[in-house]
Amino acid sequence: MTFKNPFIVRSLTAWAVALLIVAADQVVKYVVKNHFSLFESVEVTPWFHIFFTENTGMAFGMQFMATAFLAVFRVVAIAYFSIVLRRIIHSQLSWGILVCFSLIIAGAVGNLIDNACYGLIYTESLPFGEPAALTAWGEGYGSFLSGRVVDMFYFPFFTWPEQLPWIGGQTFFGAVFNLADAAISVGFVCLLFYHKTILEHHLFRLPTFRKTEAS
């Protein structure tokens, strides 16, 4: 079966990319959540560790608002960027723009799933104890919208020299993040650096409506 309608092809591609990222993000989180104790770390290479941690904040563990408000923010962002993505699909802009918005939406959805559901379906992750386990719906460690986001990717590339002020002895890029965070970051960075003009034109332009005469 072939699709000759460009709108259908672009729509299917955009949402397939988003679905693939969300699925991969959740699979990685499932493996880590079910096999690692909280703060457990496995060194893959000297500069790449799998380090299990959880947070209630935004990407890379940043804390700005309460978990429930953050969930609402994510829902609004997903809805907004989905509308923008639909406009981009119709406008026949480049595939790169389309994929960027798919990545951003997928990342927001991936972390929203943690935020909304993990408190309901997982037991508590404890430091140096037994890994968490799936449980019956509603019997987890928290309530709806109180789930903690699972992070695991840690890249301690190097440590700053001790003699440097403020940053001496600290690890360069000490953030722990997940695949959803990476998708959001890659999507935004590519848009800002490579598609600035198109971003300004399509992301911030308000919709216009044509006036019609009454019959």
Task: Give the ranges of each region predicted by the language model.
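Alpha-helical transmembrane bundles and membrane-interface segments of multipass inner-membrane proteins
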Residues: 1-215
